[in-house]
From Swiss-Prot:
KW Transport (keyword) present: yes
GO biological process: ATP synthesis coupled electron transport
Family of this protein: Belongs to the complex I subunit 4 family.
Species of origin: Paramecium tetraurelia
Subcellular location: Mitochondrion membrane
Function per UniProt: Core subunit of the mitochondrial membrane respiratory chain NADH dehydrogenase (Complex I) that is believed to belong to the minimal assembly required for catalysis. Complex I functions in the transfer of electrons from NADH to the respiratory chain. The immediate electron acceptor for the enzyme is believed to be ubiquinone.
InterPro entries: NADH_UbQ_OxRdtase, ND/Mrp_TM
GO cellular component, one term: mitochondrial membrane
Catalytic activities: a ubiquinone + NADH + 5 H(+)(in) = a ubiquinol + NAD(+) + 4 H(+)(out)
Membrane topology of the entry: Multi-pass membrane protein
Residue ranges that the Swiss-Prot or TrEMBL entry lists as coiled coil: none
Pfam families: Proton_antipo_M
Transmembrane segments: 34-54, 86-106, 115-135, 137-157, 167-187, 211-231, 242-262, 276-295, 302-322, 325-345, 373-393, 405-425, 454-474
Protein name: NADH-ubiquinone oxidoreductase chain 4
Length: 474
């Protein structure tokens, strides 16, 4: 079934017009629907298989440790045991969603190039399953590095300029620097506990000095990929030079793996720590990215700074360790993935029509493409965090937390994020929408296609659903 799907999906430009026959189109849609159902079924089978591979933890240790690992669903029937991590399930969902949208942006490639993207995505998916299910430091670090390998291949094969090579070098250098700090933290944990098993490590009593050392190494190591201030400039460069498909996957999924790694490993340290300094770094990252939105003329770079701002906001939820805040952190993670996917996809829609991402060139979208302009307006409304959206609820908790730590810093933080950053973000998009057209887009330029409308609708449907989800949690 998968082979037949590839045959009908990978068409070269010189394909015959017979493919437009109604029967052929119907058959193709049936194949794609069947492939999607098989993919969902394979997801649950793979999760069950990976759980059996790592089930030794459930057989060798008491059942109460399963709940300590963050699993939200547990089934036991004799020797058969099944558990699943909540954040891990979110990562799998984001992997599939962002992968689907990212691959949909490369329709103009030949079959051989498309096949590379599918194979890399399959490698991503296997690495994600191992990453969320393993309970060993060595395996955890191994799968974390395997995720980076696929990222390099996507950037390398998805961009065809010399600057893309520089982006690959930037990406590899900075992520490997972060991995070095994570590796040092893992080695230090092993030297103290003489074990790489998560459940043994969690029962070990760390001193405050040891815990702070481990926490600092993990914060810097994973924080480079969040990214934290001032180690985030590699991300904007990579976004600008890489393909839109990779930008969607990087912002919607890959940065979440670093946050998951930080959350899971720091949960092994059962010591109360003063995290004021780390909170200050995250606040500085939010303020810096908010101010940088004012000076951007490249829409893709503007979205990259939005990613930095929101990822630092999400990290604040996990920094405090409060269960209620972490629950909203999970929701904020999904919301950011949908929002960043939507924003990067809208940038791709603009680029395909104007052949530019610069706000100096892209003007008058509303006068030429009404549906595209309407989608951008609703995107800005969801990003603004107006009353009734999930972002409003999440930002309320973050602002309340910063105000409790320091009133002066909290007030500055609220003003910069809610006013200065939002205005800087909105003005660039509204200039592109409502300014008088300065470039003829040509008579062949069309409004949003059915595929583009479907992807945009999918993102908005997810954002609307998440808007009502907090009321179900009360």
């Amino acid at each position: 079934m998968f082979a037949v799907y590839l045959v009908f999906s990978f068409k070269k430009p010189e394909a015959s017009k017979a493919d437009l026959d109604f029967f052929m189109l119907t058959f193709k849609y049936i194949l794609k629907g069947s492939f999607f159902l098989m993919l969902v079924l394979a997801l649950f089978c793979a999760l069950f298989t990976f759980d059996l591979m790592f089930s030794a933890k459930n057989l060798l240790y008491p059942n109460e440790y399963i709940w300590d690992s963050g699993d939200f669903f547990f089934y036991k029937n004799g020797a058969l045991k099944f558990s699943l991590n909540l954040y891990g399930l979110i990562l799998v969902f984001l992997c599939l969603l962002t992968g689907f949208v990212a691959i949909s942006t490369v329709d103009n490639l030949y079959s051989e190039d498309k096949l590379k993207f599918y194979l890399i995505f399959f490698q991503f998916f296997l690495a994600v399953l191992g990453f969320i299910k393993c309970s060993d430091l060595i395996a955890f670090f191994f799968f974390y590095e395997v995720l980076m390998l696929g990222s390099v291949l996507v950037v390398f094969f998805g961009s065809y300029s010399k600057k893309s090579i520089h982006a690959v070098i930037y990406f590899v250098a900075w992520t490997q620097l972060g991995s070095l700090f994570v590796l040092l933290a893992c080695l230090y944990i092993y030297s103290l506990t003489n074990s790489t098993n998560f459940f043994v490590i969690k029962t070990f009593v760390f001193s405050k000095t040891q815990a702070m050392t481990i926490y600092s190494l993990l914060f810097v190591g994973f924080g480079i990929k969040f990214p934290i201030w001032p180690l985030h400039y590699w991300l904007t460069k990579t976004h600008v030079e890489a393909s839109t498909g990779f930008s969607i996957y990087l912002s919607g999924f890959l940065v979440k793996t670093a946050l998951f790694g930080f959350y899971r490993l720091t949960n092994l340290i059962q010591v109360e720590l003063d995290t004021t300094f780390f909170l200050a770094v995250l606040v500085a990252g939010v303020i810096d990215s908010s101010l940088n939105m004012w000076s951007q003329t490249d829409l893709k770079k503007l979205v990259a700074y939005c990613t930095i701002q929101e990822m630092n906001l999400i990290a604040i939820f996990f920094l405090k360790g409060d269960s209620s805040l972490i629950a909203y952190g999970f929701l904020f993670t999904i919301m950011h993935a949908l929002m960043s996917t939507l924003m990067f996809f809208l940038v791709e829609c603009i680029y395909s029509r104007y052949k530019s991402r610069s706000t100096l060139v892209v003007n008058g979208v509303f006068f030429s493409f009404n549906n595209l302009a309407l989608a951008i307006i609703f995107m800005v409304l969801f990003f603004s965090g107006i009353l009734g959206t999930l972002k409003f609820v999440c930002e309320f908790f973050v602002f309340n937390l910063t105000l409790h730590v320091s009133w002066p810093i909290g007030v500055i933080f609220v003003v910069v994020v809610s006013a200065i950053g939002l205005i800087g973000f909105s003005k660039n998009w509204f200039n592109a929408i409502f300014c008088a057209p300065s470039k003829d887009v040509g008579p062949d330029a069309l409004d949003l296609s059915k595929k583009e409308l479907y992807i945009i609708f999918l993102c908005f449907a997810g954002l609307i659903f998440l808007t009502f989800l907090p009321f179900l949690m009360i």
